[in-house]
A protein has these predicted regions:
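Hydrophobic alpha-helical transmembrane segments
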Residues: 3-10, 32, 77-81, 134-135
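Transmembrane alpha-helix boundary/anchor motif
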Residues: 18, 39-44, 144-147
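Membrane-interface segments at loop-to-transmembrane junctions
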Residues: 63-81
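Canonical alpha-helical transmembrane segments
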Residues: 33-61
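C-terminal binding/interaction regions
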Residues: 73, 77, 86-158
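Alpha-helical transmembrane segments in multi-pass membrane proteins
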Residues: 4, 8, 12, 16, ...
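Membrane-interface extramembranous regions at the lipid-water interface
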Residues: 1, 11, 15-16, 47-57, ...
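Membrane-helix interface and helix-disruption motif detector
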Residues: 20-32
Length: 158
């Protein structure tokens, strides 16, 4: 069941990666999309594992209760903590895509097969300005994880 949740977590982070790249391309602060990336990863994990938990799955009742409150049986602590991994990998992927697009715009004659490995190897280089965005984005992912983890613990008490 966790394997399916892990797959859902990676799939749930994809819209955040796309939004991150789009916001960065229009010269907006793309790191805001990491919050969506993290919540998408948590939602993807819980969405795929929740259907397996219930043998008599009632979709209408699920839709009504999904956004009402966080209940202990709906969310697992593992999903909150594990979803940090796909989110941070998504930040790396989004920055590599942005860096590759910037290189391709500057050197249009270079093939993409050479650009992407160069971007993957040099995205952490202090010579380029991408490292600060990666640090800020990863910090936002971790802050989102901590806030969601503690808020869910607080809400589960009631």
């Amino acid at each position: 069941m966790r394997i399916l949740g892990i797959l859902g977590s990676f799939l749930g982070a994809i819209p955040g990666v796309i939004l991150y790249v789009l916001l960065t391309r229009i010269n907006f602060y793309g790191s805001i999309a990491t919050i969506i990336m993290y919540y998408g990863a948590v939602g993807g994990y819980n969405f795929l594992t929740e259907k397996l938990k219930k043998k008599n799955y009632d979709e209408i009742q699920e839709r009504e209760s999904r956004f009402n409150a966080i209940k202990k049986e709906n969310f697992s602590s593992f999903s909150f903590l594990f979803s940090v991994i796909p989110s941070i990998l998504g930040v790396y992927l989004a920055e590599v895509i942005n860096f590759s697009i910037d290189i391709k715009a500057e050197y249009p004659e270079s093939p993409i097969g050479e650009i992407v490995p160069f971007a993957m190897a040099n995205v952490f280089s202090p010579e380029f300005n991408y490292l600060i965005y990666i640090i800020i984005s990863c910090a936002l992912v971790i802050i989102s994880a901590v806030v969601l983890f503690y808020k869910s613990r607080e809400m589960m008490k009631y």
